[in-house]
Amino acid sequence: MIKAVLFDLDGTLINTNDLILKSFKHTFKTMLDLEPSEEEITMNYGRPLQEIFKSYDENRIEEMINCYRKINLELHDDECKEFADVDLMLKTLKSKGIKIGVVTSKKSDMAERGAKLMGIFKYFDTFITPEITTKHKPDGEPVLKACENLGVSPSEALMVGDSPYDILAGKNAGAKTCGVKYTALPLEKLGESNPDFYVDKPLEILDLVEKLNS
């Protein structure tokens, strides 16, 4: 029985793919005079910024994070886009008594800003950001915290995401997992984490939950 659906935010509920790509490109060029390929950048989607930048220059992590966040904030409202039918999907889940949470690696201020900009923040019963937990995706702690806040066991939760980090976090917590095929990552990359289920588009989450609860 699925009593709660937990979502990653960027690339799952909100289309921030262009925003993230432009923010990384600007940061790498400005700070390190590097121009990584779009494929190289995309492969990092879903990882915490600190981990990503550490692999490029461990002595300038904070500078790079600050640079990234500055340009991300400047571009944010123009570059955030909706995925089709996300609002309808969330509204329908709520109407069926399903609890809804977000589990994101994005800091709370920008995560909430994006969710409010898209008009979907009102649907969330819990909103887990990196400030709330000691460990982060792919560790299961953020998913466990969301389940605790919602009063459900991990086995009663479905974690939905566009990156292996989302899927592994769900698995490590003992939740069921669902990958979204509209991910910006190569599908085989997402597949390496072996999601229990896949959906082609957000509305299919409704059919999946209904199937699991039948």
UniProtKB/Swiss-Prot annotation:
Keyword Magnesium: yes
Xref: InterPro entries: HAD-like_hydrolase_sf, HAD-like_sf, HAD-SF_hydro_IA, HAD_2, HAD_sf, PGP-like_dom2, Pyrophosphatase_Ppax
Names of the cofactor(s): Mg(2+)
Any single Gene Ontology cellular-component annotation: cytosol
Record keyword Magnesium present: yes
CDD domains linked: HAD_PPase
Domain of life according to the entry: Bacteria
One Pfam family hit: HAD_2
E.C. no: 3.6.1.1
One term of GO molecular function: inorganic diphosphate phosphatase activity
UniProt feature coiled coil, ranges: none
Entry's family note: Belongs to the HAD-like hydrolase superfamily. PpaX family.
Protein name in UniProt: Putative pyrophosphatase PpaX
Organism of origin: Clostridium perfringens (strain 13 / Type A)
